[in-house]
Amino acid sequence: MCGTIAFADSTDTNTAVKVNSSSYQDWADRTDISAKFQTNHKPQYSIETLQPIRHYDNNSKSVVFVQGKVTSHGGISHTADGYANHVTRGAGGIIYEIDFNQSTQSIGTTGSLGLGYRRLSKGEHSYVGINAFYDYAFKEHYKRASLGVEYVTGENELYANFYKSLGNGTSSYRIFKRDEMIPAPYNTPDVDVSVGESHEKRVASGYDIGYARTFKNARYIRAYIDRYHWNRMNGEIRDIEWSNPDIYNYNIGFRVNGAYKNGIKTGINVNVTPHISVGMGYDKPFGHSGEFYVQTLYTLGKSKFALFGGKHSDSSMTTARSKMLDKVERQDMQALNLNGDFRVHYPHDSLD
């Protein structure tokens, strides 16, 4: 009899633990693998997880959590290449060739790690949150930090992130001489042509402000709109300051202005099943054509809400509490890459 009583007490305790810890908060339920495809961009693959640091259950009023993510092609480098092949002013100032191109390129694999805190209101109908993240691009060694704030009330979500580049970027140049041909239509060999190569890379600082909404009887749907702004996206590629003032005063340069500096991103995500969600959206930089994107996401565990095989709503807890372990929304890293290639021909006695 005593053994039976002890067994029953143990069972009740285990049941209580399961109820309070909320089985939907299993680590796998907060770990996702995703694939994103966007116009004019390389496919982006990532794995992301959010985990509470301390014990969290349905009686907790606050949570401290860590969030980590590793992404292939986890950011964009706005690249500008300037090229000029010319003669010094003293030799006539002829420009043989000049070219300027701008493009977007992947910055490669990135990693991010963040720490966050969220606290529910007294009635559990809203919560406020704050978070800090560190981002790193492994190939280019770009570094960025961010500070974010959140406010969730009912189905409505408001968030803002402020991004700060770490370091002043990198810049380098080299000047050397070599023999090479004067371009067509001259096609004449020349000697001691001065070649100047310059490179400058820097990470953008900035901010984004977003609004998202879920729906009471269709909690598997989430719509959002996000406004972003980037600083440090302007620059100039120009002739290196040669020791010869005749060359420096030639004043060839290429301005790079506001490359994808401001824009709006909007979209919708749908949990189709407890394991699979799909999303689609539109990214519209001001002054540039917009780009569509689609995203598929696989949850290692299960999402609580889903169109098929999951709940559509939940009255057992407030909406704010059910979102306490949702992932922080942030923008990918942005960078500017300026490259200059200048060839300068001097007058020579043999050509006089």
Language model segments and positions:
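Flexible, glycine-rich linker and terminal segments associated
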Residues: 8-23, 166-224, 230-237, 251, ...
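Short glycine/proline- and aromatic-enriched beta-strand/turn motifs that initiate or cap beta-hairpins
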Residues: 8-56, 63
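Extracellular loop and loop/strand-boundary signature of outer-membrane beta-barrel proteins
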Residues: 33-36, 74-76, 80-103, 133-136, ...
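Membrane-embedded beta-strand positions of outer-membrane beta-barrel proteins
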Residues: 33-35, 66-68, 98, 130-132, ...
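Residues that define the transmembrane beta-barrel architecture of outer-membrane proteins
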Residues: 29, 41-47, 62, 92, ...
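Outer-membrane beta-barrel channels and translocator barrels
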Residues: 54-61, 120-125, 153-156, 216-220, ...
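Transmembrane beta-strands of outer-membrane beta-barrel pores
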Residues: 35-41, 70-76, 102-104, 117-119, ...
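Transmembrane beta-barrel domains of outer membrane proteins
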Residues: 50-54, 116-120, 148-152, 210-214, ...
